[in-house]
């Protein structure tokens, strides 16, 4: 009995030792495993934190939150938000016929009260409607109703609250140059669009699209233009973009039904007829008239119109994208048994500015009327983005961020922080409870089949293979790691740009509801032709540039075919190489504003649009981007001197807006003659002279105004050997001499000083 007890005791003791050893072994591996998890967590937290910091910094510089859009929709407003359907707005065109229409800016219509010299399209936008207290994301489908010399406009306005279309109304008493938003004419519980308005038996009717409820409604004006009553349901079909035309004693209803079996969306068209627009409607014998390609213009794009005895139907080409362009077809046969039409040439003046133009990407609706004067007016909606652009950008943005995350994981593989893709215990049962450096540390033994374990084992060979291939400790390996880090940063910034950066379009800044245009002028000569080519290609795409005038001072001028321009370019060859040519009176300039911009300055179009917007507030001022401060020493200094004195009293005209008549007449006056002579002697300082002339003309008022350019502005004169400012010291000495000379002639600027940061929008910080 004693021996048996002893043996049992020894066995029990041995078992306890093994258990204790196993217990310590378990805790040791648990500690190591926790260490691995902590290391991985620290690595990924550091990487993602660094990338997030870079993304936030990039967003702050590129989309600065402290700088707003003056006289646009504020960031707190509900209106003008990005919409996946687009950013439609409405422009006006004039001509002697519906086939010779030109945009309003070609008529050179000026409006002093809104600083529009000239007025330019679009004439009514989501901003003008939203700022009147009627939030809207976009305006589309314009229809005109003419009462004498008063024009009423009805259109779809996309509500940012309900995210559905309502029918808005506006009025013009100056032939469409200015529009007063009146309000919402029709608001139902369902989506409304395409407000076809017409007169019948002394009553005004509206037939908007309401296909969402499966029927076509007809409304009658109770108190025109904002009060309407449902008259009747004229057709129990979900027709879209329907219009009525009276032809040979019969009323014809033309629209599309995309819900029918086999119907081709945006490629289908039907016709119905009746003795009255109130019904009853009967289907055409050949229905559907069209049911095929979306590019043929089957879907209506506006009201059918009569011109020169012929009837025309407006359609929209949806081949490349919804509402890509307008097509017009001449109706040759329209009877109860037959319908035949043939497409005719039709084009509205298209911009080459792409997204930077309000209608540069698509136009899908056209309505034309003849005014009492005999001329024709056409209303057109246009968009700078394609349908679905917002969704597309968001997808690309998050895909870029996902790729950046993948780059971080790849770094983890290469640096040995992550040793395998799946936990080793998913691959082999006997690793249960041991340390793992897997990307996904979810250890569960016995849950996976042998095939999945083999797949996991193969995947886990990838990290060691990559480390062996790249060799992170070698020089080439370190270079590769650096490239991968930079790639991750680029992907992060690209993702932020896609998600928060908008469509990439540069939009102009309206002032009191109007947009306008300016002439861009630059002075150059043959040795700087390469500068000029870049200059024209870049700035001709800015939204508000109407024309580029090249002041050619020396050498044979280039052929216009050498310049890639989206706007007309005019080369003015000078007889004498003089800096005074910059401000020579030019009667061919049609805009009031001129931007004098040197050909060696490269800045974003958005900066230029801001400067133009500021100048429109104060056209009597010289508005520019490069401030200088002149003190009692009369020593010319760079911008940092003005910053150190927290103010400026001069703006360089190498990048400045001015009133072409006021500035050029003043510069060429007899009073400025001695100054011009000194400019020719020094071959310098024409911009300084103009500042002195502005100061004299302004009296005690503010003569110049600064607009801060972005950080990406580049002065290419630093890389050129032909700039007059190449030798900085000599250049500054000449300009100091000019300051003293012009002070003697025109008085000092010393007692003038305007501080930075005076604008609420932050554009002059």
UniProtKB/Swiss-Prot annotation:
GO cellular component, one term: membrane
Pathway: Sphingolipid metabolism
Membrane-spanning residues: 43-63, 394-414, 476-496
GO biological process: lipid glycosylation; protein glycosylation; response to abscisic acid; response to salt stress; seed germination
Reaction it catalyzes: an N-(2R-hydroxy-very-long-chain fatty acyl)-(R)-4-hydroxysphingoid base + a 1,2-diacyl-sn-glycero-3-phospho-(1D-myo-inositol) = a 1D-myo-inositol-1-phospho-N-[(R)-2-hydroxy-very-long-chain fatty acyl]-(R)-4-hydroxysphingoid base + a 1,2-diacyl-sn-glycerol
SUPFAM superfamilies with a match to the protein in the record: Arabinanase/levansucrase/invertase, Nucleotide-diphospho-sugar transferases
Residues reported to bind substrate: 553, 577-582, 598-600, 628, 683-687
Keywords, in A-Z order: Disulfide bond, Manganese, Membrane, Metal-binding, Transferase, Transmembrane, Transmembrane helix
Tissue expression: Specifically and highly expressed in developing embryos and mature seeds. Also detected at low levels in stigma and pollen.
Record's subcellular location: Membrane
PANTHER family for the chain: ACETYLGLUCOSAMINYLTRANSFERASE (PTHR48261), GLYCOSYLTRANSFERASE FAMILY PROTEIN (PTHR48261:SF6)
Protein name from the UniProt record: Glucosamine inositolphosphorylceramide transferase 1
Originating species: Arabidopsis thaliana
Recorded name of the encoding gene: GINT1
């Amino acid at each position: 009995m004693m021996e048996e007890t002893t043996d049992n005791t020894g066995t029990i003791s041995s078992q306890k030792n093994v258990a204790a050893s196993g217990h310590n072994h378990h805790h040791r591996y648990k500690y190591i495993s926790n260490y691995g998890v902590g290391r991985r967590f620290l690595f990924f937290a550091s990487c993602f934190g660094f990338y997030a910091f870079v993304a936030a910094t990039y967003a702050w510089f590129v989309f600065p939150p402290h700088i707003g859009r003056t006289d646009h929709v504020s960031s707190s407003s509900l209106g003008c938000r990005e919409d996946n359907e687009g950013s439609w707005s409405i422009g006006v065109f004039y001509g002697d016929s519906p086939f010779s229409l030109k945009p309003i800016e070609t008529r050179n219509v000026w409006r002093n009260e809104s600083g529009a010299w000239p007025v330019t399209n679009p004439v009514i936008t989501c901003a003008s409607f939203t700022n009147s207290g009627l939030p809207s994301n976009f305006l589309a489908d314009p229809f005109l109703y003419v009462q004498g010399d008063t024009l009423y406009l009805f259109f779809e306005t996309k509500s940012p609250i309900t995210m559905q279309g309502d029918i808005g109304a506006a009025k013009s008493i100056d032939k469409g140059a200015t529009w007063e938003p009146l309000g919402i004419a029709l608001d139902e519980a369902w989506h409304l669009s395409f407000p076809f308005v017409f007169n019948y038996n002394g009553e005004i009717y509206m037939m908007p699209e309401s296909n969402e409820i499966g029927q076509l409604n007809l409304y009658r004006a109770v108190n025109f233009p904002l009060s309407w009553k449902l008259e009747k349901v004229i057709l129990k079909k979900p027709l879209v973009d329907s219009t009525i035309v009276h032809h040979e004693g019969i009323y014809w209803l033309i629209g599309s039904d995309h819900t029918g079996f086999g119907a081709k969306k945006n490629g289908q068209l039907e016709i119905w007829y009746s003795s009255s627009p109130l019904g009853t409607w009967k289907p055409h014998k050949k229905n559907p008239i069209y049911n095929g390609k979306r590019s043929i213009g089957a879907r209506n794009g506006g009201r059918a119109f009569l011109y020169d005895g012929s009837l025309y139907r407006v359609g929209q080409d949806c081949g490349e994208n919804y509402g890509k362009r307008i097509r017009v077809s001449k109706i040759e046969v329209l009877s109860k048994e037959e319908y035949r039409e043939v497409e005719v040439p039709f084009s509205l003046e298209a911009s080459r500015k792409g997204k930077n133009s309000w209608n540069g990407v698509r136009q899908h609706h056209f309505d034309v009327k003849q005014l009492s004067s005999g001329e024709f007016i056409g209303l057109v909606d246009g968009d700078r983005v394609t349908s679905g652009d917002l969704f597309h950008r968001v997808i690309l943005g998050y895909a870029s961020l996902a790729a950046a995350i993948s780059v971080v994981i790849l770094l983890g593989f290469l640096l040995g922080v992550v040793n395998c893709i799946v936990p080793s215990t998913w691959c082999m049962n006997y690793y249960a409870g041991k340390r793992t450096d897997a990307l996904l540390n979810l250890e569960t033994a016995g849950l996976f089949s042998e095939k999945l374990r083999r797949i996991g084992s193969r995947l886990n060979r990838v990290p060691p293979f990559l480390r062996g291939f790249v060799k992170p400790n070698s020089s080439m390996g370190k270079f590769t790691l650096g490239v991968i880090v930079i790639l991750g940063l680029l992907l992060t910034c690209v993702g932020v740009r896609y998600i928060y950066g908008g469509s990439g379009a540069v939009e102009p800044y309206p002032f009191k509801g109007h947009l306008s245009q300016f002439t861009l002028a630059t002075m150059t000569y043959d040795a700087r032709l390469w500068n000029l080519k870049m200059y024209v290609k870049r700035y001709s795409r800015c939204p508000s540039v109407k024309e580029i005038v090249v002041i050619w001072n020396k050498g044979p001028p280039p052929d216009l075919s050498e310049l890639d321009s989206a706007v007309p370019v005019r080369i003015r060859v000078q007889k004498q190489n003089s800096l005074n040519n910059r401000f020579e009176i030019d009667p061919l300039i049609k805009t009031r504003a001129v931007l004098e911009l040197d050909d060696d300055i490269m800045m974003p179009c958005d900066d230029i649009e801001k400067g133009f917007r500021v100048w429109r507030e104060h056209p009597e001022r010289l508005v520019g981007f490069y401030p200088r401060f002149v003190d009692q020493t009369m020593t010319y200094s760079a911008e940092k001197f003005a910053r150190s004195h927290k103010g400026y009293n001069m703006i360089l005209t190498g990048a400045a807006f001015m009133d072409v008549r006021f500035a050029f007449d003043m510069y060429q006056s007899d009073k400025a003659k001695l100054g011009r002579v000194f400019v020719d002697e020094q071959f310098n300082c024409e911009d300084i002279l103009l500042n002195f002339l502005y100061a004299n003309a302004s009296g005690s008022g503010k003569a110049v105004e600064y607009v801060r350019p972005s950080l990406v502005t580049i002065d290419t004169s630093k890389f050129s050997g032909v700039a007059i400012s190449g030798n900085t010291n000599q250049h500054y000495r000449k300009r100091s001499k000019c300051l003293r000379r012009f002070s003697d002639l025109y008085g000092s600027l010393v007692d003038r000083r305007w501080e930075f940061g005076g604008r609420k929008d932050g554009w002059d910080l």
